[in-house]
Structure formats: C-alpha cells, structure tokens
C-alpha cells in the first residue's frame, strides 16, 4: 500500500524540493536515472537543476533517455516525437560553423539534451547571468541570442550535454577534420 501522499515515484527528499549540492551529487552518482543508458553526461551538467527537473517529470526524462540510447546512427535527419509536445528530438546531419558564425542561445520552455552521434564539434557554455541579450526571446521558437564569453568543450560520441534555461550555449562550432556532424537535440519541456 502506498502511504506516500505525493506519489510512489517521489522520495521525501524530492517531494520536499530540498535538493542541495550534496544530495544532488549523491543522486547523480548513483546513475539510476540512466536506466541502462550507456552514454555519459558531460561534466558541466548542473546536478541540482537536473535532479529537480528529473524528479518533477521522471516519465518525460526516462522517455528522452530511452530515445538517446537507441540506434541513432540508423535514424534519418528530421523531427521525432517522443512524448507529444513535451519531449521531441531533432536529428541533423550538416556542416558545423566557424566560431564567428555560431550564435550563443538559451531557451525558456525546453531543456536541451545535445549529443553528437557522428563526428565532433565544439560547444561553448556560460551562465545566463554573464551574457547580454543580442536578440530578444522569440517565444514561438523558444530561444534568445546572446553576446557572451564562455568556455568551449569538445562534443563527441559517448558524452551528452544538458542545457537548462540558465545555460547559455553555443553549439555547432567547427572542429577541423569533422566538417559534417550528425547530432541529436532532444527537447524536454521545463517542469514547473
């Protein structure tokens, strides 16, 4: 019998929304959320926000990670519905951009899971608090562009990136020798 009034999938910790650096790191390290996913999250993942979002909408995240763990190399470029309008994926197979052509962006309604299926690219990351809006938020397309300085990381098969609304990111930056990159961006609606 379920005596937890919040629900069987919620722990007291998550029901009380008391995630902190230690509790989130402990939960993250257990990797139960991966459900067998062989890929690894990038070191830049905000564990507190991820723990909060995952526990607010476990079903959506589990579906997203199931898709991410599938045979993505066999999928054609295009949009894939995963869970209605709340979780979907876009697979691209296209040239990367010179750094000056890649734009800083952030989203309000959706969290990005970005994963390079084939090839390599650089991705810039910086906190929203350090960026200046260069193109105001476009609600229909859920993005704003920014002027920013940030740290760049190499994205390649085996590791995925998570970008929350406070993460300004600049994907699709060219790595010499990998001019064309196949990647997936899975959009997971932000849980309130």
Feature roles, as predicted:
Residues 173-177:
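Short proline/glycine-enriched turn/loop segments at secondary-structure junctions
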Residues 73-135:
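Mid-length scaffold segments of soluble, non-membrane domains
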Residues 1-19:
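Bacterial Sec-dependent N-terminal signal peptides
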Residues 160-162, 178-192:
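A short hydrophobic beta-strand segment most commonly corresponding to one strand
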Residues 154-172:
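Conserved metal-binding segment of the jelly-roll/cupin
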Residues 11, 21-91, 101:
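A short, N-terminal "cap"/entry segment at the start of jelly-roll beta-barrel domains
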Residues 121-155:
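A short beta-strand-loop-beta hairpin characteristic of the jelly-roll/cupin
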Residues 109-113, 121, 151, 159, ...:
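Generic beta-strand structural signal
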């Amino acid at each position: 019998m379920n005596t937890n009034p919040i629900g069987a999938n919620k722990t007291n910790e998550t029901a009380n929304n008391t995630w902190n650096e230690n509790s989130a790191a402990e939960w993250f390290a257990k990797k139960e959320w991966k459900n067998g996913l062989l890929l690894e999250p990038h070191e830049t993942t905000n564990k507190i926000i991820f723990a909060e979002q995952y526990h607010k909408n476990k079903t959506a995240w589990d579906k997203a990670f199931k898709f991410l763990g599938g045979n993505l190399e066999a999928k054609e470029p295009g949009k894939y519905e995963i869970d209605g309008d709340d979780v979907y994926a876009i697979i691209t197979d296209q040239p990367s951009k010179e750094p000056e052509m890649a734009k800083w962006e952030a989203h309000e309604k959706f969290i990005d899971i970005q994963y390079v299926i084939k090839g390599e690219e650089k991705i810039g990351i910086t906190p929203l608090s350090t960026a200046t809006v260069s193109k105001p938020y476009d609600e229909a397309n859920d993005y704003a562009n920014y002027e920013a300085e940030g740290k760049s990381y190499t994205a390649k098969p085996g590791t995925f990136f998570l970008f929350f609304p406070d993460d300004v990111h600049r994907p699709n930056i060219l790595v010499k020798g990998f001019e064309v990159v196949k990647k997936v961006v899975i959009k997971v609606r932000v849980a309130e």
